[in-house]
Swiss-Prot record:
Biological process (GO), any one: cobalamin biosynthetic process
Name of the protein in question: Phosphoribosylaminoimidazole-succinocarboxamide synthase
Keyword NAD listed: no
UniProt record similarity statement: Belongs to the SAICAR synthetase family.
InterPro entries the record matches: SAICAR_synt/ADE2_N (IPR028923), SAICAR_synt_PurC (IPR033934), SAICAR_synth (IPR001636), SAICAR_synthetase (IPR050089), SAICAR_synthetase_CS (IPR018236)
Source organism superkingdom: Bacteria
Pathway membership: Purine metabolism; IMP biosynthesis via de novo pathway; 5-amino-1-(5-phospho-D-ribosyl)imidazole-4-carboxamide from 5-amino-1-(5-phospho-D-ribosyl)imidazole-4-carboxylate: step 1/2
Length: 237
């Protein structure tokens, strides 16, 4: 399957059309951003690591019965995916306090959250992805009530699957975001799951193994991503 026209260039991925109108090529670049794209740097191997990491996670979620857009890997940095009509709202699950939640509520980082928190954010970099709720989604027509309920159900199911997967690898799944779209009327998981859009801590040391290493200038970003991938059994080379 050959990629054709560039359709969209995001902060770290590029989307291309193919000869099949129902399929797209997703290319993972080496770009890494923070502050809604205000700060961007390139890291060798990052596109490859995230592409293979994402394929591994999407495969695990599909095995658990969660519909995903993933079709197959095409190269070290590219995968073939279904073309979705993306919902402009992202779902976030929080198993521990971190990130914007800590700032918003003025609470300590690392508190276990039981049951996990579920948040919704409008995908809008210019507005810094404002937090919204189910009422906003219905009133502004971003997603139907039924489809939003399905997105929430699938997000919690993914959390159950991934918490165990990472726990078995000696990691804490602190929080993560998921994006969904519609494919022939069905809610399907799209975009990606990688250390770019999740928080992962070492279970023993609580060392951060995700993009917070870049956001907080801790260094060792790719080394951390590759360490997480190896623990999970992702084949990188």
């Amino acid at each position: 399957m050959q990629k054709q026209a560039e359709l969209y260039r995001g902060k770290a991925k590029t989307v291309y059309s193919t000869e099949n109108p129902d399929l797209l090529v997703l290319e993972f670049r080496n770009d890494t951003s923070a502050g809604d794209g205000a700060r961007i740097e390139q890291f060798d191997r990052k596109g490859m690591v995230n592409n293979k990491f994402n394929y591994f996670i999407m495969s695990k979620l599909a095995e658990a019965g969660i519909p995903t857009q993933m079709e197959r890997l095409l190269s070290d940095t590219e995968c073939l995916v279904k073309k979705l009509d993306m919902v402009p709202v992202e779902c976030v699950v929080r198993n521990r306090t971190a990130g914007s939640l800590v700032k918003r509520l003025g609470i300590e980082e690392g508190i276990e959250l039981n049951p996990p928190l579920f948040d919704l954010f409008l995908k809008n970099d210019a507005m810094h992805d404002p937090m919204v709720n189910e009422s906003y989604c219905e009133t502004f027509g971003w997603v139907s009530k039924e489809n939003l309920a399905r997105m929430k159900e699938l997000t919690y199911k993914a959390n159950d699957v991934l918490k165990k997967l990472f726990d078995d690898a000696g990691l804490i799944l602190v929080d993560f975001k998921l994006e969904f779209g519609l494919y022939k009327g069905e809610v399907v998981l799209g975009d990606e799951f990688s250390p770019d859009g999740s928080r992962l801590w070492d279970k023993e040391t609580l060392e951060k193994m995700d993009k917070d290493r870049f956001r907080q200038s801790l260094g060792g970003l790719i080394e951390a991503y590759e360490a997480v991938a190896r623990r999970l059994g992702v084949q990188l080379d």
